[in-house]
Design a protein with these regions (language model features):
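Short, well-ordered secondary-structure micro-motifs
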Residues: 40, 76-77, 94-95, 117-120, ...
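Short acidic/polar capping segments at secondary-structure boundaries
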Residues: 9, 70, 88, 111-113, ...
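A short, well-structured beta->alpha microelement
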Residues: 6-12, 45-58, 110-122, 171-179
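A polyampholytic, Gly/Pro-enriched intrinsically disordered region
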Residues: 72-74, 101-113, 175-187
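Class I S-adenosyl-L-methionine
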Residues: 1-99, 185-186
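Short, glycine-/small-residue-rich phosphate/pyrophosphate-handling segment
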Residues: 89-127, 136
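A contiguous loop/helix-start segment that scaffolds small-molecule binding in enzyme catalytic cores
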Residues: 2-3, 15-16, 46, 62-63, ...
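Short, charged/polar "capping" segments at the starts of alpha-helices
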Residues: 33-39, 114, 139-142, 167-168
Length: 193
C-alpha cells in the first residue's frame, strides 16, 4: 500500500507523487484528494471515494491512498505502507508568511480534541513558539482567542483560508482584533511573528 500526499491545493504534487500516481491501478481518497490527483491517474485505474476511514488498513497491498496535504501532518500517514510526502498547508503558509519552520509548533484540534488543542496552543505561545493550528469547522476559535487575549502581547493571528487554491486568503491581525474564519478549509498561525 502507498499513501500519497497530493498537496494542499492544485499544483502542489511532488514529482515522486506524480510518478507513483501514473502507475496506480487502484486509488482511494476523498473527493478533494481525487480531484487534485485525477489528471495523473492512468486510464483504467479504479478510483473510489472514501467515506469510511476506519477500514483503510484492510485495503489490498496494491492500493494507493490519497491524503490531502502531507500524510504526516494530521493525515493518513499512520497507515502501514510507503508514505510519499506532499506539500502541506503548513509549508505553504510558512512560505507565504516567511515564518521559519524551526519556530513552529503544530497543534491539531480535530474531533474531540478541541479542549486539548486550546490548552496546547496557549502553552506553546507562552513558550515563545509560533503555533500552526489545524482545527475542524466545529472548533470554537473565538474561545481560543479569548484565552490568548489574556497573554502578554504582541500576539498576532494569521488566518489562512483555502491555501493553494485561487480563492486563497491570508489575513494577519492582532489578538485584540483577531480574524474570523469564513470557510471550513482554514488554518491559523498564532504567536509573535
Amino acid at each position: 500500500m502507498k499513501i500519497i500526499g497530493v498537496g494542499c491545493g492544485p499544483g502542489m504534487l511532488t514529482e515522486q507523487a506524480i510518478k507513483e500516481l501514473r502507475r496506480a491501478r487502484m486509488v482511494f481518497g476523498s473527493e478533494r484528494a481525487i480531484g487534485l490527483a485525477r489528471a495523473y491517474l492512468p486510464e483504467g485505474c479504479q478510483i473510489k471515494s472514501i467515506d469510511d476511514y476506519k477500514n483503510l488498513s484492510r485495503l489490498h497491498s496494491d492500493a494507493v491512498i490519497l491524503s490531502t496535504g502531507d500524510p504526516m501532518l494530521a493525515g493518513l500517514g499512520y497507515l502501514s505502507g510507503e508514505v510519499i510526502p506532499g506539500i502541506s498547508s503548513l509549508q505553504l503558509a510558512s512560505a507565504r508568511l516567511h515564518i521559519p519552520l524551526s519556530r513552529v509548533s503544530v497543534v491539531v484540534a480535530h474531533g474531540r480534541g478541541h479542549e486539548k488543542g486550546m490548552a496546547e496552543t496557549v502553552d506553546e505561545v507562552k513558550r515563545g513558539k509560533i503555533v500552526f493550528l489545524l482545527a475542524d469547522p466545529k472548533f470554537n476559535v473565538m474561545e481560543l482567542y479569548a484565552r490568548l487575549a489574556t497573554l502578554t502581547p504582541p500576539i498576532q493571528v494569521a488566518l489562512c483560508e483555502n491555501l493553494g487554491y485561487p480563492e486563497e486568503k491570508i489575513l494577519v491581525k492582532t489578538i485584540q482584533s483577531p480574524p474570523e474564519p469564513s470557510t471550513a478549509l482554514y488554518s491559523l498561525f498564532i504567536g509573535n511573528f
